[in-house]
């Protein structure tokens, strides 16, 4: 029932979400209340919100294996923005998140991109999961799902997920099960394509003889449009 937040001199990492004791690099927790620049305030608030989110996503409920690390980090990324948006709407964190997300779009447009979740067989594979696809793309997918379901139904599903798996391990299917159970929506059918397929779609619209025709393909840098599915 107690949570301490500690600034540590020369802390190698940015911050670490130990249960009940979050440790930070000094510059990510301590601010001059008078002289701190607006960007510093946003950065500190974002970091604190991210680490506090891990008390639920990562500590209370932990992924079964490293392939599911997005369940921890994408939720923490989503919650850091949502919390700051509620705390200081004037910061417009969802707007700035759109800029942050662009880094994931860039990576996801390469032929060498990966899926959000893939089989982890080695420490190197696990280390490779900590990138913009896990954090920014994963957070953007959760935001997309929230906007599809509506804030209340999304929150109800996530709460059911946390309550059902408290102090236990989960995988992505457990999240979809929980949200489907409370919302009645085909969440797995919608979201699995985003989690298990690389890239993102480019939708092409054309007007042919008075009829609107829609098609899509995976977007790639330097690729000319060719009609697919």
Model-predicted segments: where are they?
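Hydrophobic alpha-helical and helix-loop surface patches within well-folded domains
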Residues: 1-217, 221-227
